[in-house]
């Protein structure tokens, strides 16, 4: 089963509305929307803004629903000039943009004791790219694969 997380209602509402056989389950202060999307079992949930909310929600998806893959969807900023509104970015790796221990010899974004970057599941990333390319949406928008950054600074 696949879990799909969005921080805000606007990021998950159309997915929830598209679920076939939708049921809602309340757990831990979250409303999980379970159903089928393109004949695949999914659980869609609004996590709330921030890394902690996303982590808590992801843990509940794993423990309560047995998801084996999690997709985070939503609105984001970009540092590159080659992306437009509604373009897709699929991560190849991720890092924190709001964590700085460089004074202690760590790389920017690196949490002590952890790798400086988190490597994405290449198989899942490739599936997302394949699915995107099969949608009419892909004719008007592009998809790129690369480094993404996460943080709680706005």
Which residues does each PLM region occupy?
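Extreme N-terminal starter segment of soluble prokaryotic enzymes
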Residues: 1-3, 42
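Short, hydrophobic beta-strand segments that form beta-sheet elements in well-ordered domains
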Residues: 4-5, 148
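Short N-terminal binding/cap micro-motifs at the start of the first secondary-structure element
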Residues: 11-15, 53
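A short, Lys/Arg-enriched amphipathic alpha-helix followed by its capping loop at the start of a domain
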Residues: 14-20, 36-40
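Glycine-rich phosphate- or other oxyanion-binding loops that anchor nucleotides, phosphorylated ligands
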Residues: 25-154
